């Protein structure tokens, strides 16, 4: 049976929304949603939290996350990319648990609107298509062929050229929602991008488009969770 590691990466120094990973939405800290969803999926023996914050670590432990290392400062800066953080968590986990994981599934702590069913279906898609890695996305509300623009040399131009006059006629585009990342071990260790020759895509519901990077994002996510009256059992 394959060994699947779940990682949840949550640093303490969030700038757009202060302490966002432990701010409460509907009586649950934001990071708690991802931990509960991971547990409810029944896919994981280990749910490992990568954080530089003692407060985040304490709260994660309360909900069943495993915290056995402190993320190093260079991996917790504003400029730190996420793939090295996930790679670090994988290697530390293999050393700690004395095993080798075949697959890593990362749940973004700032994207609490997924469900455990989303995690399961994304993993099933990954396995069925024999992908090296998989990303999640939602149908894009804006399209570079139609209504996204750039300013080049002082002139306003479409982001991508094309003679399209209706939204229905343009090629389908998707908006990465940063909710779920799945990697084969070797792909994660050997690549610094989520885009490869055999990258899979799992399309999620439009309501999962929001990951919390601003106060407006937080208010929208809070509204959606409260509007649906979502509780821990619902994930």
From Swiss-Prot:
It comes from the Bacteria. InterPro entries: CMP-NeuNAc_synthase (IPR050793), Cytidylyl_trans (IPR003329), Nucleotide-diphossugar_trans (IPR029044). It holds the Pfam family CTP_transf_3. SUPFAM superfamilies: Nucleotide-diphospho-sugar transferases. Required for biosynthesis of LAH modification in the post-translational modification of Campylobacter coli flagellin. Belongs to the CMP-NeuNAc synthase family. Disulfide bonds: none annotated. One of its GO terms (molecular function) is N-acylneuraminate cytidylyltransferase activity. This is Post-translational flagellin modification protein B. It comes from Campylobacter coli.
């Amino acid at each position: 049976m394959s060994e699947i590691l779940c990682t949840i990466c949550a640093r303490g120094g969030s700038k757009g929304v202060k302490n966002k990973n432990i701010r409460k939405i509907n009586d649950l800290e934001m990071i708690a949603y991802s931990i509960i969803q991971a547990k409810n999926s029944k896919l994981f023996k280990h749910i490992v939290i990568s954080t530089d914050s003692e407060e985040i670590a304490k709260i994660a432990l309360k909900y069943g996350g495993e915290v056995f290392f402190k993320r190093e400062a260079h991996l917790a800066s504003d400029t730190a990319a996420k793939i090295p953080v996930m790679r670090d968590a994988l290697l530390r986990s293999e050393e700690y648990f004395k095993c080798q994981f075949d697959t890593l599934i990362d749940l973004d702590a700032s994207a609490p609107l997924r469900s455990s069913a989303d995690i399961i279906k994304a993993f099933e898609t990954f396995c069925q298509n024999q992908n090296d890695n998989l990303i999640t996305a939602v149908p894009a509300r804006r399209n570079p062929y139609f209504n996204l623009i750039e300013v080049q040399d002082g002139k306003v131009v479409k982001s991508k050229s094309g003679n399209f006059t209706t939204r229905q006629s343009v090629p389908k585009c998707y908006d990465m929602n940063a909710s779920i990342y799945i990697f084969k071990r070797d792909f994660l260790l050997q690549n610094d991008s989520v885009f490869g020759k055999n990258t899979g895509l799992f399309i999620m519901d439009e309501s999962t488009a929001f990951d919390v990077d601003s106060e407006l994002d937080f208010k929208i996510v809070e509204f959606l969770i409260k509007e649906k009256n979502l509780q821990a059992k619902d994930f």
